[in-house]
Curated annotation (Swiss-Prot):
This is Nucleoside diphosphate kinase. The keyword Chaperone does not apply. Keywords: ATP-binding, Cytoplasm, Kinase, Magnesium, Metal-binding, Nucleotide metabolism, Nucleotide-binding, Phosphoprotein, Transferase. GO terms for cellular component: cytoplasm. It catalyses: a 2'-deoxyribonucleoside 5'-diphosphate + ATP = a 2'-deoxyribonucleoside 5'-triphosphate + ADP; a ribonucleoside 5'-diphosphate + ATP = a ribonucleoside 5'-triphosphate + ADP. NCBIfam families: PRK00668.1. One of its GO terms (molecular function) is ATP binding. It is found in: Cytoplasm. Pfam families: NDK (PF00334). Belongs to the NDK family.
Amino acid sequence: MAIERTLSIIKPDAVAKNVIGQIYSRFEGAGLKIVASRMAHLSRADAEKFYAVHAARPFFKDLVDFMISGPVMIQVLEGEGAILKNRDLMGATDPKKAEKGTIRADFADSIDANAVHGSDAAETAAVEVAFFFPEMNVYSR
């Protein structure tokens, strides 16, 4: 399997619960390296631009409002099959449907406040990583 990079965001609900370290431990325990990381409080403009693909969807305003409601932790994960591995760690979008032991099953409250975001494909990951991290700020190790 190829070495990949994927974007991960720990959303405001999980940051507020003080579980960043527990989530990072899961990434590292699965063999993923954190090669870039920063905390940010997204502006409305940044959240709208990042989630622009969902602009026509009925949940867009609520998603943006939620993502700007508090700080988020944004990281780039690197490793073999990182995109799928991270999606497996996250679990289903709806925490009620997420498998026991996944990040969303353990830390999310609802389909809206679902603890984490992860890129869904290589093309998306490249765009999302570039959105938050200029290449010079990502370090393979």
